[in-house]
C-alpha cells in the first residue's frame, strides 16, 4: 500500500497505476518508461501498462515517482513517473523459467536467456532474449443495475438503462417516455420503456491473451561506455475501459531502440514505436449499429407504442377500478387530475403482473416486426444472423460506414540526449529531446481521411543544478525545462 497511489484494473490483462488522486483508466498525465523509453501507444495516446511491456523475469528495478516531474521528464509527467529498468545481460546471465496458474483459467509462462563475454579491459558483447505468454478468462462485465442516467428503475415493466447492456439508453427527444399528462391519458400503463439492448458478454471477447517478446544486443567499448540495440514486440487481446468499452483484439506493438551510454555520465538514445490496432472495436457502438441494422430507434419505438394502443390500451381501460377516460374524460383534467392519476397508479400496482406481461408482448412485437423495406427483426445473440451482422460491423472502419472497428497504424520517433558535467562546486545536468508523431487512423481516431497525412513534432530541453553541503547531508537542486509542441506555445517547467 503506497500513499497516493491507486491501481485500477480495466480488465485482467490491463493494470493501470495512477498517482495524486487522478484515478483513471487512461492516465495520459503519467509517464511510463522502460529503459528510458516511453511506453505509450502513439495513436491511442495512453500507456498500455505491462500488457505490452517488459517480461517480469527481466525487470531489475521499478521506481515510482509520485508527483509532478515535468522538470526532467517533460509535461506528460504531470502526475508522476513509473520508471522500469530491465536487467543487463552482462550482469544477469543464464536461463530463467517461470510459470504460474490461477483462477479464471489463468496460465502464464516466461523464459529469459542471457549470456555474454567480456575481457579484462571491459570490452565485450552480450545478448538477452525474453519470451512471455499469458492466457486467461477475463472478468465479465455483468452489472445490470440501472445507470445514473436511467429514468426508470429495475422494477419498471418497460425496462431500464442497465450499466453493462448497450443500446438500451433513452431514445432521443423522450420518444420512449409516456409518463406525462398526455401519456397518462392516451397510453395508460405504457410509461417509460427502453429498447432491447445487448449485454457486453455478447459483444466482447473475454479470452485474454498476451504474448511478449524482447531481445537486446549490448556491446561494451570499455568498462564505462556501451552501445545497445533492443527490440520489443507485444501482441494480444484484452478489454479496455475508456469513454466506452473497447475490445482490443490482436493489437500489436513494437519498439526499436538504439542507445550509447555511460552510466551516470551521458546517453544518446533513439527509438521508434509502432502500433497496429488489429481487429479492435468499440463494443458500445457495435451494439448501436446492430440495432440500427435491424431498424431505427424511431421505428422500434413506434412499433412498441402502436402495439400498446391497439392491443393493450383497451385491456387497461377495462381493468377493475380504472378511471376509463371514454366513460368519464373530465376526471383526467382540472382539480381532479391528480387524484385520478393516483387511482390509475393503484390499479397498475394491483395488476402489475398483467402490466409486465403486456410490456413483454409489446417488446416482442417491436423486436420481431420489420414493417419497412430494409428492416429486420432483432438479432438474437448466438444465431447465424447475429454472427453475420456482428462480423460485418466489427470489420468496417467507421461509424458512418456502419462499422465500429478502429484502424490505427500510428508511430512515433524519439531522440534524446543527456550529459552530466561535474565541476568541483556542483553537478550540472543538461539534456534535450525531439519527437515526431505520425498518426494513421483512416479517420477512425484522427481527421486523416481523404488522403490527409498528419504529422506532429515536439521538442524540449532541461537544465538541472545540484549542490551538496554539510558533508553531503544537505542537497539543494534546481531544475528548469522548456518544451515546444508544434501546435502550442512554449511551456516552462521550473522545479
Predicted regions mapped to residue ranges:
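Structural signature of Gram-negative outer-membrane beta-barrels, strongest in the C-terminal barrel
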Residues: 222-223, 230-235, 260-263, 273, ...
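Outer-envelope beta-barrel architecture signal
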Residues: 28-30, 91-95, 107, 121-127, ...
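Extracytoplasmic beta-strand/coil segments of soluble accessory domains associated
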Residues: 2-38, 60-61
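Short sequence motifs at beta-strands and strand-loop junctions characteristic
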Residues: 9-11, 74, 102-105, 203-210, ...
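Outer-membrane beta-barrel domain signature, strongest for Gram-negative TonB-dependent receptors
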Residues: 154-428, 432-435
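Hydrophobic, lipid-facing positions within transmembrane beta-strands of outer-membrane proteins
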Residues: 15, 80, 93, 107-111, ...
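Short acidic/polar hinge/loop motifs at secondary-structure boundaries
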Residues: 38-66, 85
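Short strand-turn segments of transmembrane beta-barrel domains in outer membranes
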Residues: 69-71, 81, 86-118, 131-133, ...
Amino acid at each position: 500500500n503506497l500513499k497516493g497511489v491507486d491501481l485500477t484494473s480495466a480488465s485482467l490483462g490491463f493494470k493501470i497505476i495512477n498517482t495524486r488522486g487522478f484515478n483513471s483508466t487512461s492516465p495520459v498525465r503519467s509517464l511510463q518508461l522502460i529503459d528510458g523509453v516511453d511506453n505509450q501507444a502513439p495513436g491511442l495516446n495512453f500507456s498500455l501498462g505491462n500488457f505490452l511491456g517488459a517480461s517480469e523475469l527481466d525487470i531489475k528495478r521499478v521506481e515510482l515517482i509520485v508527483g509532478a516531474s515535468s522538470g526532467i521528464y517533460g509535461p506528460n509527467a504531470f502526475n508522476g513517473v513509473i520508471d522500469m529498468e530491465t536487467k543487463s545481460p552482462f550482469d544477469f546471465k543464464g536461463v530463467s523459467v517461470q510459470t504460474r496458474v490461477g483462477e479464471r483459467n489463468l496460465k502464464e509462462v516466461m523464459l529469459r536467456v542471457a549470456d555474454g563475454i567480456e575481457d579484462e579491459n571491459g570490452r565485450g558483447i552480450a545478448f538477452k532474449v525474453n519470451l512471455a505468454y499469458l492466457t486467461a478468462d477475463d472478468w465479465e462485465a455483468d452489472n445490470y443495475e440501472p445507470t445514473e442516467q436511467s429514468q426508470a428503475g429495475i422494477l419498471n415493466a418497460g425496462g431500464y438503462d442497465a450499466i453493462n447492456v448497450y443500446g438500451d439508453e433513452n431514445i432521443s427527444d423522450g420518444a420512449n417516455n409516456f409518463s406525462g399528462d398526455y401519456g397518462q391519458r392516451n397510453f395508460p400503463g405504457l410509461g417509460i420503456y427502453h429498447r432491447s439492448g445487448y449485454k457486453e458478454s455478447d459483444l466482447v471477447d473475454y479470452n485474454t491473451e498476451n504474448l511478449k517478446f524482447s531481445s537486446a544486443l549490448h556491446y561494451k567499448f570499455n568498462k564505462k561506455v556501451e552501445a545497445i540495440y533492443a527490440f520489443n514486440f507485444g501482441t494480444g487481446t484484452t478489454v479496455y475501459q475508456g469513454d466506452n468499452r473497447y475490445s482490443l483484439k490482436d493489437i500489436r506493438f513494437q519498439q526499436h531502440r538504439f542507445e550509447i551510454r555511460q552510466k551516470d555520465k551521458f546517453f544518446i538514445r533513439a527509438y521508434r514505436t509502432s502500433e497496429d490496432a488489429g481487429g479492435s472495436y468499440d463494443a458500445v457502438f457495435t451494439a448501436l449499429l446492430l440495432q440500427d441494422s435491424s431498424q431505427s430507434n424511431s421505428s422500434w419505438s413506434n412499433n412498441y407504442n402502436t402495439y400498446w394502443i391497439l392491443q393493450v390500451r383497451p385491456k387497461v381501460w377495462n381493468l377493475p377500478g380504472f378511471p376509463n377516460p371514454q366513460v368519464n374524460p373530465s376526471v383526467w383534467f382540472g382539480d381532479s387530475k391528480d387524484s385520478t392519476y393516483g387511482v390509475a397508479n393503484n390499479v397498475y400496482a394491483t395488476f402489475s403482473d398483467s402490466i409486465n406481461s403486456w410490456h413483454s408482448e409489446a417488446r416482442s412485437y417491436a423486436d420481431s416486426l420489420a414493417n419497412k423495406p430494409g428492416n429486420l427483426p432483432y438479432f438474437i445473440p448466438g444465431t447465424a444472423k447475429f454472427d453475420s451482422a456482428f462480423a460485418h460491423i466489427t470489420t468496417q472502419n467507421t461509424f458512418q460506414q456502419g462499422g465500429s472497428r478502429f484502424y490505427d497504424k500510428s508511430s512515433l520517433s524519439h531522440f534524446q540526449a543527456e550529459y552530466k558535467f561535474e565541476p568541483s562546486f556542483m553537478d550540472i545536468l543538461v539534456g534535450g529531446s525531439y519527437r515526431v508523431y505520425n498518426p494513421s487512423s483512416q479517420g477512425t481516431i484522427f481527421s486523416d481521411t481523404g488522403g490527409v497525412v498528419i504529422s506532429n513534432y515536439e521538442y524540449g530541453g532541461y537544465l538541472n543544478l545540484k549542490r551538496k553541503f554539510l558533508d553531503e547531508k544537505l542537497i539543494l537542486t534546481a531544475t528548469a525545462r522548456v518544451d515546444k509542441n508544434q501546435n502550442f506555445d512554449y511551456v516552462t517547467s521550473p522545479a
